[in-house]
């Protein structure tokens, strides 16, 4: 079936009205919507449990499997690091989703295919187009935000870790490192609206929107911003 450029996001929004536990992931060639997911996280399963689950999983498509994120603290599963920093907010060491069905969009051919039990999700697929028409009539709200992070303090901290990284590189301990800063923002902006705006301002090779009970996780490659 053919689709227009705005269809995938609208389809995803409509799907989430019925199946809230659904994610969206995209790269330069495709968009994948994982529908009606069950979740596996570190509060219920060990890392070994996840590996066993993957080995015994029967996929409904070539790209099916667990989708999720690792928190920084997951490094303790693989490396002996004594330092454990206090958390600024709670998030499990890892959380993965196992989708019951998939909607796959091919960006080159502008066609999409469904993978899963069609009889179970047929009603949603037929009503996605109607949702797209109604969404165009919605009025945009005035979005506001305020930065709560002390930007000067965060900048100074970032400079310190850059100097520390340079020292490690010179000493031969590391040859590549990913540095980052944290920013706390208060806003009335819906997370999905943020994702849509991010895709316009920073159309990166890989992006995802992953809602969880611990908070919505949005990811984007930073190459263009850099």
Predicted regions and their residues:
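Extended alpha-helical targeting/anchoring segments
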Residues: 1-226
